[in-house]
Regions:
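Generic recognition of short, well-ordered alpha-helical segments
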Residues: 40-43, 72-73, 104-105, 152
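Thiol-/selenol-based redox modules, centered on thioredoxin-like
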Residues: 105-108, 112-161
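Conserved helix-turn-beta segment immediately C-terminal to the redox Cys motif
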Residues: 24-26, 35, 39-62, 83-86
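Thiol-based oxidoreductase modules, predominantly thioredoxin-like and allied folds used
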Residues: 56-74, 89-100
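Short, internal strand/loop/helix patches
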Residues: 76-125
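A short beta-strand-turn-helix
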Residues: 6-26, 47-52
Length: 161
């Protein structure tokens, strides 16, 4: 099964898949949190979504509360925070475990992807990024401190469009 077909749920709880959510677009999948030192990356993610969207690209946010409880809100609180604070207009999924015994099936597969240094395994922190091409293959893994405007991330996005 392609990553694009793994069953997911939207932030409002509706069943979906990446294919249903964003069509045949390339996707930057990011585990997000509202109360993290890296939360300002939302601004850059919004900019990526808007800049590359017309070329067949979408950011998809995956709220996660596994890292020091930094995404404690309800779905409504998360949506409100994202839209009013950062103007988030990209899709958000339901709060999801990215590590551990309850790790979502999507992240079970993503965790095997190595980053640029060849390191695979558990998601390290909030705002870890996975670039998924239009065919549902992982085209890159970017660690949390890689900002949305980092040249290596921009180049990777360009390469899948």
């Amino acid at each position: 099964m392609s990553l694009r077909e793994v069953p997911l749920r939207t932030l409002s709880g509706e069943p979906t898949t990446l294919a249903d959510l964003v069509g045949d677009r390339a996707v930057l999948l990011v585990n997000v949190a509202s109360k993290c030192g890296l939360t300002p990356q939302y601004s850059g993610l919004v900019e990526l979504h808007r800049s590359f969207g017309p070329r067949g690209f979408s950011v998809v946010g995956v709220p996660c509360n596994q890292f020091m409880g930094q995404e404690p809100g309800t779905a409504e609180e998360i949506q409100q925070f994202c839209s009013t604070t950062y103007g988030v207009d990209f899709p958000l999924l339901e709060k999801t475990d990215v590590n551990g015994d309850q790790r979502h099936a999507l992240y079970e597969r993503l965790a095997d992807t190595p980053d640029a240094e060849g390191n695979a395994g558990d998601i390290q922190w909030n705002f870890e990024k996975f670039l998924i091409d239009r065919d549902g293959k992982v085209a890159g893994r970017f660690r949390p401190r890689t900002t949305p405007d980092a040249p290596e991330l921009i180049a990777a996005i360009e390469s899948v469009l």
